[in-house]
Every structure is written in structure tokens, then in C-alpha cells.
Amino acid sequence: HSYGKSAVRELKDMVRACHSQGIEVVLEMPFVPGISANYVTECLRFYMLEYHVDGFVLNPYNVPWEQLIEDPFLKDIKLMQKDDGFQNVMRRFLKGDENMVNDVIWALKNRSSENGKCNYITTQTGFTLWDLVSYDCKHNEENGEKNLDGPDYNYSWNCGAEGPSRKRAVVNLRKNQVKNALELLLTAQGTPCLLAGDEFCNSQRGNNNAYCQDNETGWVNWT
């Protein structure tokens, strides 16, 4: 979302500012199944050449990996595949599902000798970390789709009360669960990815698909 008149200029300025501070910029590009390999390649080329981004996160479906790796314009940039495996294992472990210890150990230690690995427990497509420990079910009523949109299986646990709570025991348990999640994320082999706002327990009030909420629900309030 752009707050000015030129979204193109804003993004270019942001990438330039990040690079000046030694920060690489990696874009997530969620291509839908069935899209042509050439279209995917052209899109990535455009953002790399026009905006000078450093890499892309792609979904694992219908992505022409070999074509991208061999492309002369893209061969030296970072290409990452989105994988919810680590996320789901850690979420189930945190909520207390049985027989998860072996899966957690494997997920913490697993790392390819040939490729890098990025781990995440929350992303922009789903619950925030605070909502993950505050809601058992999604609450997307405000999206106008009769709460049918967004993931149904979140592997979340509300710690004893659905949504905001003033009970000290519930709030303290939620804070401990957030700390547990961050410890798992930061100690796992690979690069940790933290959703913006999770570091201060940002909430979307149970909305796990807030793409259409250009308001306090979807915003991250840094103040």
C-alpha cells in the first residue's frame, strides 16, 4: 500500500535506503497454480532489474526452478521456496499436541548442506504470533466473506480464553508461549523470519486474512 502519489518511487527509495544500511530486500511472489514459466521468469526479471531487489520467496507449486536458476539475469540472486513444515510442527508442539518431540528435534536440526533455509512460525498470511496464542478459531467476519476466507487449520491455542482477556493467568501464559515460540525460532538451524509486529505482540483481533483491512486491524502501529 502506498501513502504517496508514486508507489514505484516509494518502493525504489525503500530498497535504496535498506541497501545503504546493509539490509537485503527479498520479495514474496505468490504465483497462482497454472501460470506460465515464462511469465514467472519475466516478473522476477522485472523486479530485479527495475527495483534491484536481492531475491524472492516463491510458493512450491508450479514454479520453474530450473529455468530460474539457469536464467542469466537471475542466476546470482537468492531464490527461496516457502515451506510451512517448520511452522506447523512448532505450532503443534506449542499447543501441546502429542508425539511431537521427535518432529521438533528434526525441524530444529534440519538444514540442507547445499541450500539455505528460512524458518518462520507466523507470516503475513495467517495469525500474528499474539493471535496464535489468543484464538482457537479465526475471526474474519469483518472481511465480508462470512468468515469463509483464510486458513481453517491454524494449530493455535487461546490459553484458556478466546480473544482479549484480563485474567492474569491467561495473559502470563500467552506471554510465556510467545517467548517459547521465539526461542524455538531463533535457535533452529537456518535463518529466522519474524513477522513485523510480533516483537511487541501485535494483534489483528483474530483475523488471519487481513489483506483487505486497510485500518487498525491490518496496520502495524509502531508507536
Where are the language model's segments positioned?
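Residues that flank catalytic or metal-binding motifs in active/ligand-binding sites
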Residues: 1, 116, 216
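Substrate-binding cleft of carbohydrate-active enzyme catalytic domains
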Residues: 1-51, 58
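Active-site-proximal loop/turn and secondary-structure-junction residues that shape catalytic pockets
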Residues: 29-33, 62, 200-202
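Short, function-defining helix-loop hinge/capping sites that tune catalysis or transport
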Residues: 30, 36, 139, 206-207
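Repeat-unit-sized solenoid/scaffold elements
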Residues: 42-46, 51, 78, 82, ...
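Conserved alpha/beta catalytic core and glycan-binding cleft of carbohydrate-active enzymes
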Residues: 52, 61-196, 200, 209-213
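Extended hydrophobic/aromatic segments used for targeting, binding, or gating
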Residues: 204-223
